[in-house]
Each structure stands twice: as structure tokens, then as C-alpha cells.
């Protein structure tokens, strides 16, 4: 049973796709690269038991509308800190469709190779998300579902938004630390994490992004 499979990360990998030699090879590569355990499940078969902390890789290349609706409904009933990731996603898959996926934490497009998938999953295991900058902006500003469904990997935390708003008024790290009653090192850690989440390289870009995407 899949719920008996555990990993050192506290996570397990569930690849939902059409069984094939290629899918089996991909799963094996991911398991070896990430030192994580997991299982392949036939996308056309129902599945009720998804273990806590599971990372669900949904192969969009094998999903028609009926299957998408089934799996969205299935995953929406799970509240045990699972993370949903879309694999082989068409480049033109609408953002409004992506936000309908419960617990969505990342989107891998069909044009991305296996090493990008491995790199993205490494970030997921660290509690990050894997979105393009445009998609991240959309989810933050438009998607109430995303904010509700995401748990430990919320795209921007309340504290990160506080710090971004401090940056908008020109506050230094020291001033931010004093105003929020935290250390400068903690501020730097938050800045590092949020820069990665919104795909910017410096404070100026972060302020520009915040002005476009956050309310004061």
C-alpha cells in the first residue's frame, strides 16, 4: 500500500499518469535523484488513500477534461498537507485552470527537461513553490483558492508581505528588523526566500514587483 511508503524527507512522491516504460523510468530517476520514495498510479483509476505529506505529480499529457475534474475533486477532499504539481503542462494551459487545482505548488511545462523537474522538486522539498514569475503574480493577486489551499508552502507569507511593504517605503534591513521586532539576519533570510519566490534579484526589482502586485 502506498500509505506504507515513507521517506527521509517526510514526503512521498506519487506520479499519476498512464503506466508505461517511460513513466517508470522517470519515476525511478526522480526517486534516485531526490533520495525519496514513491509510486506510480494509473491516472484512469480512482484513488482514495493519499498519504500525508504526499507530493502529487499529475501528468497533464495524459489528462482529459473528465480526468482533470475527477482528480481536482479528489484532491480537494484531502487536507493532509499534500502538494499538487502539474507535469508536462501545455504552454497554453490557462492560469485560471491552474488555480483550480487544489494544493497547487508547482507547474512543470512540457518543454522542460527532467533536470528542471528534479531542480524544481528539490525546491518543493525545501518548502518552496515552482512557478514562473507571471504565474506567481497571477496566483498571488487573483487566486483566493490558491491562498486557501496552500499550507506550509504559501507563495508569500504574511511576514514576507510585511517586509515587501517596508521595502516600498525605502526601509533598510535594520529599520525593518526594529519595526517588526526581529533580527537583521531574520530579515535577510526572509528577503532571500521572497526574492526566489517572486523571481527577482534585488530590492529595486522586488519593490517594482510589489508595486504591481501587492496592496498596501
From Swiss-Prot:
An MF annotation (GO) of this entry: DNA binding
Domain HTH luxR-type: 149-214
GO process terms (BP): regulation of DNA-templated transcription
UniProt keyword terms in alphabetical order: DNA-binding, Transcription, Transcription regulation
DNA-binding feature ranges: 173-192
Protein's UniProt keywords contain DNA-binding: yes
InterPro entries membership: CsgD-like_REC, Sig_transdc_resp-reg_C-effctor, Tscrpt_reg_LuxR_C, WH-like_DNA-bd_sf
Pfam families for this protein: GerE (PF00196), VpsT-like_REC (PF21155)
Function: The master regulator for adhesive curli fimbriae expression; necessary for transcription of the csgAB operon. Plays a positive role in biofilm formation.
Database matches in PANTHER family: DNA-BINDING TRANSCRIPTIONAL ACTIVATOR DEVR_DOSR
Name the UniProt record assigns to this protein: Probable csgAB operon transcriptional regulatory protein
Source organism per UniProt: Salmonella typhimurium (strain LT2 / SGSC1412 / ATCC 700720)
Gene from which this protein is expressed: csgD
